[in-house]
Amino acid sequence: MAPGTGRDFHLHLVSDSTGETLITVSRAVTAQYAGVTPIEHVYPLVRSEKQLDRVLAEIEEAPGIVLFTLLEKDVAVRLEARCQEINCPSLSIIGPVMQLFQAYLGADTTGRVGAQHTLNADYFKRIDALNYTMMHDDGQHVESLEEADVVLVGVSRTSKTPTSVYLANRGTRTANVPLVPGIAIPRQLETLKNPLVVSLHAAPERLIQVRQNRLLSIGAGPGNEAYIDRQSVTEEVIHARRLSVKHDWAQLDVTRRSIEETAAAIMKLFADRRRQRRPD
C-alpha cells in the first residue's frame, strides 16, 4: 500500500515452518498503526522451488508487503529477487537476528526448520486442547461449545470420547455431546458458528455388539433392555441421522473405522472447511 492510497493492504507471510513467528511479529507491528488492516496471506511449510512458485503467483496477483522466514538460501534469494522485480517490499524476519547472533557467538546455525516451536507452540497447544476436551466430555459445559474447533455428536458407543482425546492430543479442541433418545439437544448446539460439528454414526448391529460388551464389563443387571434392543437402537440411529440432516452437520460412519481412521477423517473435514472459509 503506497502512502495515502488506502488503509488496507496485502501482507504475505512466507515460512518454511508454521508461520507463527511471522504472524506474531507482523501483528505486533500492525497494531502500532491505527485504522490499518492487513489482508493476511499465510504460506506455511514452503521448502521447495515448486511450493515457492505458488506463493509467487499469489503475491503477483495481490501485491503487498512480503515477510519471510526461510532457512533454505536458494528459496529465500529467489523470493527476494522476484519481489524486487515486481516492486514488492520484502524482509527476512529472522535473517538479521541470525546474523547478529552469528557475529557475536562466532558459531554457525543448525539450520533446523521450526526449531523455535519444538516446545512452546506444539506443547502448549496440546495441553490447552486436552484441558478443553476433558472439560467438555459427554455434554459438559455446553455454554462454551463455541470455543471448540470440533464438536462430535452421536448416540452412545460411537467412540466420541476416545476420538475427542485423540484429536486433543494433536492440538484440536474437541467437545462431544451425546444424542440421547427422548432428550432434546442443547440449544447451544443449534447456534454454533465456529466449530465443525461432526455426527458419528454406526450400524445398529455394531452398536448392539459394543453395548453388550460394555454392559458385561460393568456387570450391569436387568433394566437395560432398550439399550441393546434392535428396534430401539435402529430408531436411535435413524433419529440421529435426521438431526444431522436438519442441522447440516457433517456425518461420518465409524462402523468399520479405528479411532485413528475416524480422527484422520475428521481432521480432513476440518482442514477442508478452513480452506473453504478462507477469504479470497
From Swiss-Prot:
Its EC number is 2.7.11.32, 2.7.4.27. Keywords: Kinase, Nucleotide-binding, Serine/threonine-protein kinase, Transferase. GO terms for molecular function: ADP binding; ATP binding; phosphotransferase activity, phosphate group as acceptor; protein serine/threonine kinase activity. Disulfide bonds: none annotated. It holds the Pfam family Kinase-PPPase. Belongs to the pyruvate, phosphate/water dikinase regulatory protein family. PDRP subfamily. HAMAP family: PDRP. This is Putative pyruvate, phosphate dikinase regulatory protein. It comes from Nitrobacter winogradskyi (strain ATCC 25391 / DSM 10237 / CIP 104748 / NCIMB 11846 / Nb-255).
